[in-house]
Amino acid sequence: MLAEDNTTIKTYDQDVWAKMPDMTLPLAPSLQIIEGLHVRWTNLLSALPEDAWSRKATHPERGQVSMDDMLEIYSDHGHNHAKQITDLRARKGW
């Protein structure tokens, strides 16, 4: 979306992804990946010129979305995962 005009965003089957062989690894490597991505994205997104936020891509489930929309979607997605983890911890007494 930042490197290509009007690109199509590729989706994937989350259930299949969750069953990949690396699901048995400790949590730490996955958290390190997420932390690294967030460091890179913070650097990239904070340096974007204003006009980049209106760049468009096609999302198979949402239709046309802007860079601004995608940041909101990703942020909401992360908050939802954090809530799921918090709720699971409360249910399990962790």
Where do the model's predicted regions map?
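Acidic/histidine-rich alpha-helical segments that form the ligand environment
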Residues: 14-54, 74
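Short, contiguous alpha-helical
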Residues: 1-17, 42, 56-94
